A protein has these predicted regions:
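Histidine-acidic metal/acid-base catalytic patches
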Residues: 2-21, 36-39, 91, 171-187, ...
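Active-site acidic/histidine proton-transfer and metal-coordination neighborhood
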Residues: 7, 91-187
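Short, flexible loop segments at the rims of nucleotide/cofactor-binding pockets, characterized by
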Residues: 25-28, 98, 164-166, 194-197, ...
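Active-site beta-loop-alpha junctions enriched in small/polar residues
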Residues: 27-31, 51-55, 84-86, 125-127, ...
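Acidic (Asp/Glu)-rich catalytic clusters
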Residues: 37-45, 62-80, 110-116, 152-156, ...
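Charged helix-capping and loop-helix junction motifs
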Residues: 62-67, 98, 102-105, 136-144, ...
Length: 279
């Protein structure tokens, strides 16, 4: 088991968790925590959204996951988990691909009792270029079986399943999925960067169609062409408008995760969010 540079007990940290820093999650792959970022997250009082990918699942054992979980939970940090997604297809018409996808998701679900996360974020996985036409219903039926299993498994541990947009062109490609999952506790994770880079519908249309079902936000910016994961304000997204519209639909804030991909971009994200936070 890899040694971590942080004690498991006590509250630790170099700053008091106040303001916006205590209201948001910050994304971080589990492998990065094990390779040095754990100490920074503890020192800065950050609430993590921990990415669980194939590398983490294959490299580390239960003891590694349990120890990292204890370090955060003993310090009163809230945790969210992001399930594996690369090369996975939760609605695949290929039985072997579907089986492998469900196996990887099940491996992530097994970690829920360790981390006690608020949410488990999964990619909904629809792409009209691959699953359009007659394959749409096959994709939907397989997806529903996949997500009902996951939602049922995690609900007893107090975690909420949230499904995130990636290549979906507009909310119309997700509405029937959420309609059919009504009653499972499954909610929508609106990813602002993805709707800008890959979608065709503006943010206000997403919020109008699915705003009441939003349980989580992924906030990052881009210039409208690539999934750059820039600091908020460094791209084309109008975050004051997006959050303002959401606040008119949601009386209390959803879970909010910041997803910059450079360490230097975190503080600018926090500063902007502090200025425009509408709740």
């Amino acid at each position: 088991m890899k040694r971590l540079p942080v004690n498991e007990g006590g509250r630790g940290g170099s700053m008091v968790m106040t303001g916006i820093r205590d209201r948001v999650q910050v994304n971080i792959p589990f492998t990065w925590l094990m390779e040095g970022y754990l100490e920074l997250f503890v020192k800065e009082g950050l609430h993590p959204e921990i990415g669980i990918d194939a590398q983490a699942l294959d490299r580390y054992d239960d003891g590694d996951f349990q120890r990292v979980a204890r370090i955060f939970l003993n310090r009163g940090r809230s945790v969210t988990l992001h399930a594996p997604f690369l090369d996975l297809a939760p609605g695949s018409p290929d039985p072997l691909v579907l089986s492998l996808t469900r196996k990887r998701l099940e491996q992530a679900v097994r970690l829920i009792p360790f981390f006690r996360p608020r949410t488990l974020v999964c990619h909904a996985g629809y792409d009209g270029r691959r699953y359009g036409g007659e394959l749409r219903q096959v994709w939907l039926n397989n997806s529903l079986e996949t997500w009902r299993r996951v939602a049922d498994r995690i609900r007893g541990h107090g975690a909420m399943l949230v499904l995130e947009n990636v290549y979906e062109r507009g909310p119309e490609e997700m509405i029937d999925l959420f309609d059919a999952l009504e009653g499972t506790g499954t909610r929508f994770c609106l990813d602002t960067g993805h709707l800008s880079a890959f979608g065709e519908a503006p943010a206000d249309r997403w919020i109008e169609a699915l705003g009441s079902r939003i349980g989580q936000l992924h906030l990052h910016d881009n210039r409208g062409e690539e999934d750059e994961h820039l600091a908020l304000g460094d791209g084309v997204l109008d975050f004051p408008s997006i959050l303002g519209q959401l606040a008119r639909q949601l009386p209390s804030p959803p879970v909010v995760t910041l997803e910059p991909h450079r360490e230097a971009d975190l503080e600018p994200c926090l500063r902007l969010l502090e200025d425009i936070w509408p709740w």
